[in-house]
Design a protein with these regions (language model features):
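Feature captures the catalytic cores and cofactor-binding loops of soluble hydro-lyases/lyases
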Residues: 1-139
Length: 139
């Protein structure tokens, strides 16, 4: 079945922006069966993951109340790579309550706990996902 996979809470502050390339083979299998699939996320994927159309690094990230935090199961989503657009059809997202992000007390891995302070101060993807403050990415 055709679908858009929405993977939120993968941005710099929520989850440290992990590499999501392992999704490509799974989504690619659906493409191989003739389905149209795409991925929309506030996370990141390597350039080697180009088989599946993907809108990545969306900001503000879901944890900060970005648009992905308001998308619900069943929403119709159009991904237009040529125009660089993601649209949620027939829905006013501003009227929805943002979904809650992961609860930090449930983090079980050493890495997630150890790097929590860095995630708390990270800038958004548009600003470089830096823990050193705002970076001028235009230079």
């Amino acid at each position: 079945r055709d679908f858009v996979a929405v993977l939120r809470f993968q941005g710099p502050r929520a989850n440290g922006m992990p590499e999501l390339h392992k999704l490509t083979p799974i989504l690619g299998l659906q493409q191989d069966k003739g389905f149209k699939v795409a991925l929309v996320t506030d996370g990141r994927m390597s350039g080697a993951s180009g088989k599946v159309p993907a809108a990545i690094h969306l900001h503000p990230e879901a944890l900060l109340g970005g648009p992905l935090s308001r998308i619900e199961t069943g929403d119709l989503i159009r991904v237009d790579p040529a125009k660089g657009r993601v649209e949620v059809l027939n829905v006013d997202l501003t009227g929805r309550t943002p979904a809650l992000g992961p609860v930090r007390t449930n983090l079980s891995s050493l890495g997630m706990n150890m790097f929590a302070p860095q995630r708390d101060i990270a800038t958004d993807a548009e600003s470089g996902a830096s823990t050193l403050g705002e970076l001028d990415v235009t230079k």
